[in-house]
Amino acid sequence: GILLNPELNAAAAYVPHGFGLWRQRHYLILGLPLLQLLETRELAAVIAHEFGHFHGGHGRFAGWIYRLRSSWYRLMQGMAGGGMAGGQLFWLFFRWYAPYFDAYSLVLARRHEYAADEVAAAVAGADAAATALVRIELVSDWLQRGFWPDIHNSAHAQAYPPAQVHAQLSAALATQPFAPVALPQWLLEQEADPDDTHPTLAKRLAALGVGTDLQVQARGPASAAGSLLGDALVQQLEQRFSHE
């Protein structure tokens, strides 16, 4: 299935059966802001990357480990929240074993991220895969440092919640150029998060064969959201997400 949410993100989700050791149901989760940020070919690269996690051609064992990590994390979250049957015994076992499994499987999981990037490059081109990665990193930083702090400050300064937050975000994504002359040095010097399977941006660009002299041009007038969903549906989603 395909799900839309209000996040600047995309993910391949796995709903496990039998503790994630055999049958799984697959979901592709796409954030509306992501669709509004990217051009259609860049979005195709992102989707191909996520489908690459389902692909078994680049090392079936690494792919299975990647999916098993995702399944176990969701299982642990369900147990911790009391939303799944299983009892205290299962919860104690998973809480004890998960750190060991996480440490030993991280290298394989990161290798699978590179394999998924290869799928993205094969489908949409290495240039589209690279520019999508850079746009997402730049806008994620802008959201954390600029947009969301401004929204929170507005909420504290007025007696009512900010209205149409996601419409404001859509307008900002349409007007912000997010096209630096050169990649910021801080972006290239980011260190890997020990809890994240994704390699650093610099390593992912290098694996794609894209140099650090990459220049990301301003997005064209048509976003992937407008091209694929249509303006009317985008406005309905913005209103729904703003009310939630």
Place the predicted regions along the sequence by residue:
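Peri-catalytic and regulatory segments of divalent metal-dependent proteins
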Residues: 1-63, 67
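Short linear motifs at secondary-structure transitions and domain/linker junctions
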Residues: 3-7, 21, 81-85, 171, ...
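General N-terminal targeting signals
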Residues: 16-21, 45-47, 71, 78, ...
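A broad detector of the eukaryotic-type serine/threonine protein kinase catalytic domain
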Residues: 30, 35, 73, 98-102
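Catalytic or ion-translocation cores adjacent to nucleophile or general acid/base/metal-coordination motifs
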Residues: 62-80
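Cytosolic-facing loops and C-terminal tails of multi-pass membrane proteins
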Residues: 85-109, 114, 118, 122, ...
